């Protein structure tokens, strides 16, 4: 068994990754939306579960982060979803909406 503490590089192509991001945002049908960190964590888990990571099978990942270049891809694809009016950014810090942690959220349009 191999252990890897490096950020995880995912192998999803842009279209597949974009659809996964949209599904996560739409599937979280709450007014408070989903944070960037939560989206990246779920994408990381999906990539591990689907064997779509750059490291060989049997690797135990000890880092919760996507590789920096994949975080940039996620960010760019989220902006595409915003421009397509499929999601929007929820700004604000309302404890009533559960927005007290300082992170803006992505919500289904």
Regions found by a protein language model. Name each.
Residues 30-66:
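Short acidic, hydrophobic short linear motifs in intrinsically disordered regions
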Residues 6, 16, 52, 57, ...:
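Intrinsically disordered, low-complexity regions of eukaryotic proteins
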Residues 92-109:
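Short, cationic-aromatic polyanion-contact patches
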Residues 8-11, 64-68:
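Charge-dense, low-complexity intrinsically disordered segments
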Residues 1-45:
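Short alpha-helical segments that sit at the start of domains
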Residues 65-83:
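Short amphipathic alpha-helical interaction segments
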Residues 21-23, 47, 76, 108:
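Sequence-pattern detector for short linear motifs
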Residues 82-92:
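A short, conserved structural fragment
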């Amino acid at each position: 068994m191999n252990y890897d503490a490096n950020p995880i590089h995912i192998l999803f192509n842009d279209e597949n990754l974009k659809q996964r991001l949209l599904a996560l945002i739409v599937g979280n049908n709450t007014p408070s939306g989903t944070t960037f960190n939560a989206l990246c964590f779920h994408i990381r888990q999906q990539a591990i579960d689907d064997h779509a990571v750059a490291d060989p099978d049997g690797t135990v990942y000890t880092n919760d982060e996507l590789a920096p270049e994949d975080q940039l891809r996620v960010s760019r694809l989220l902006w595409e979803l915003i421009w397509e009016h499929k999601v929007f950014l929820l700004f604000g810090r309302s404890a009533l909406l559960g927005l007290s942690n300082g992170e803006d959220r992505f919500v289904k349009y």
